[in-house]
Regions:
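A phosphate-binding catalytic loop at a beta-strand-loop-alpha-helix junction
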Residues: 279-297
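Cysteine-based protein phosphatase catalytic domain of the PTP/DSP
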Residues: 194-280, 301-334
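Glycine/serine-rich anion-binding loops at beta->alpha junctions
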Residues: 133-143, 147, 285-291
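Phosphate-handling active-site elements
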Residues: 12-16, 111, 122, 152-165, ...
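Short, small-residue alpha-helix embedded
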Residues: 141-152, 293-304
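Short, hydrophobic/aliphatic alpha-helical segments
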Residues: 22-23, 80-81, 118-137, 269-281
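Conserved glycine-rich phosphate/nucleotide-binding loop
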Residues: 151-192
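Amphipathic alpha-helical interface segments
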Residues: 1-110, 115-117, 126-130, 145-147
Length: 337
């Protein structure tokens, strides 16, 4: 049931995905019901990636007609039950039911940016529900997480979790994200041509430095954590320093930052967590003109109890060239009115 990577390889070909899902399942679980479950879940993941919708039923047409009604009933039961009701969740059928139950029965929060509540919190809440169902929790959570991540995107994963996330052998979060990007053939080389600036201290917290990407070549004294708001090449990562990537795109387009308010808030929570650990933080983007000032302003607003726009004035006092794009400014007003 850990079939999400299969989906990425066949996003543009539903028929090929159905065939691949069943063949991969057959490698270890030759029971046709195991193949059915993988087909259903793979098609649900594909649909979620392409549309953002959560629907476990759309793949029923690809299930043998003799078992189709049975699977429909099983999904009905999942939606009427709690994950903990599926005691035999090491079996693929009940594992799928437990995962779908956690997703379907966990309410999607109503967005309230100023209160720090977001609809994408559904990913975190539903995964918590899946784990608390008990028994074979890693399987159920892996199944649920594949679909939730497909619907909400990597930017909906809390930074606190991303700091812990890892793969084998020795893969960190950024490595796993890069692997997924390569599977969908979206990886492209990149470089930056900027005029380097001198890092400056945050006006409301001298343990936070604001900088451009060039600062990675020579960190300010004492910096032991880096929060990157732009893409960073592996070769540019400073040695011996924890680095956390944040997906924040400096473009004013509807699909550029689907989870913008959450990402800004979550990044500020990350900085607060790092500071509470006694870390000195470097916050940077490419040129320190739009993304970094925005996050720095949200951080200042939260720590000082002021409006976002007033906090931004403080940021521009140390970064005169700061000018967050219009979407970022609107988000700043929503998050810290």
């Amino acid at each position: 049931m850990r079939t999400a990577p299969v989906v990425l390889a066949h996003l543009d070909d539903e028929a090929a995905l159905v065939e691949a899902a069943r063949k991969v399942s057959d490698l270890t679980h030759y029971d046709p019901e195991a193949g059915d479950a993988c087909v259903l879940w793979c098609l649900a993941i594909r649909h979620a990636i392409l549309t953002g919708e959560l629907d476990a039923r759309l793949g029923l047409q690809h299930i043998d007609i003799d078992r189709r009604n049975l699977w429909s009933t099983r999904l009905d039961v999942a939606e009427a039950s709690q994950p903990s009701d599926f005691k035999n969740n090491g079996w693929v059928v009940e594992a799928l039911q437990g995962a779908w139950s956690a997703i379907a029965r966990t309410p999607v929060p109503q967005d309230d940016p100023a209160m720090g509540v977001f609809s994408v919190d559904h990913l975190r809440l539903a995964l918590n529900t899946a784990v608390r169902g008990g028994k074979d929790t890693d399987t159920v959570a892996a199944i649920a997480g594949g679909l939730l991540g497909a619907a909400y995107g990597a930017s909906a994963i809390p930074a606190e979790w991303r700091r812990l996330l890892h793969g084998w052998p020795g893969l960190a979060t950024r490595d796993l994200a890069a692997l997924a990007t390569r599977i969908v053939k979206a990886d492209k080389p990149f470089s930056y041509d900027i005029e380097p600036m001198a890092p400056v201290r945050h006006p409301h917290d001298d343990g936070v430095w604001l900088a451009d990407v060039a600062a990675l070549q020579g960190l300010p004294p004492g910096v032991d954590a880096v929060v990157s708001l732009c893409r960073v090449n592996d070769d540019d990562l400073p040695a011996g320093v924890e680095q956390i990537d944040v997906r924040l795109i400096d473009r004013v387009e509807p699909d550029a930052n689907p989870n913008l308010d959450f990402v800004l808030t979550d990044t500020v929570r990350l900085i607060e967590q790092l500071r509470n650990e006694g870390r000195t933080v470097l916050l940077h983007c490419v040129a320190c003109q739009s993304r970094t000032p925005t996050v720095a302003a949200v951080y200042g607003a939260r720590t000082q109890g002021m409006s976002g726009m007033l906090a931004l004035q403080g940021i521009t006092s140390v970064l005169p060239g700061a000018w967050p794009n219009s979407d970022f400014q609107k988000a700043l007003e929503r998050l810290a009115p």
